[in-house]
Structures are given as C-alpha cells and as structure tokens.
Design a protein with these regions (language model features):
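Ribonuclease/tRNase effector modules and their secretory precursors
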Residues: 1-98
Length: 98
C-alpha cells in the first residue's frame, strides 16, 4: 500500500476538536477497518478527491484524500451518522445502523 501523509496542524486540530487523529485512521485502514474507497460525491468542487470510509469502534468516519503515485494525502476526518447507518447493519434499540 502507498504511504500516507497529512498536515500536522490539521491533525492537531482534529485531535482537539474531534478526538481522532490521522494516525488512528491509518491504523484502522491497515487493520482491516476500511469499509470502502469512494469517489468524492461533490466531484465538481473536489475533482481530484476520493473518500476512505473507515470503521472506528462502532462508528464510521469518512476521510477525504488526494492520491498520487507515491501516497495518499489525507485532508480531514468527518464522523458520519449517515455512513454509520449505511455501512453497519446492526439493530440498536429502535434505530437501525446500516
């Protein structure tokens, strides 16, 4: 697999504001928690971006990235209720996850 890269300042902001880091994303990708690799849904505004969909514990995060020949450059980490429902097919109380 290609190398991963990111902006360290962005990583610190994500750690402080969302409680997750790019290192954790890479760990989960490397340990089988990658659920999908998708084209960015807004290809007009983000023409060269794709999205990793990863599972971290019982929640799904979307991680936009740009790919070149040597690496994946991770842009941000977004917790996603919608993706959690779409990708995790479990019943939890009255809510269906997935």
């Amino acid at each position: 697999m290609k190398a991963f890269a990111w902006d360290e300042q962005k990583n610190e902001l994500l750690k402080d504001n969302r409680g997750i880091t790019f290192e954790e994303v890479v760990y989960h990708i490397n340990h089988g928690d990658l659920l999908a690799k998708l084209d960015h849904p807004n290809s007009v505004r983000y023409p060269h971006q794709q999205i990793f969909v990863i599972k971290v514990e019982e929640y799904v995060y979307v991680v936009p990235f740009v790919e070149d020949k040597e690496r994946y450059f991770l842009k941000t980490i977004i917790p996603s209720r919608k993706s959690t429902r779409e990708f995790l097919k479990e019943r939890k109380g009255d809510y269906e996850i997935g």
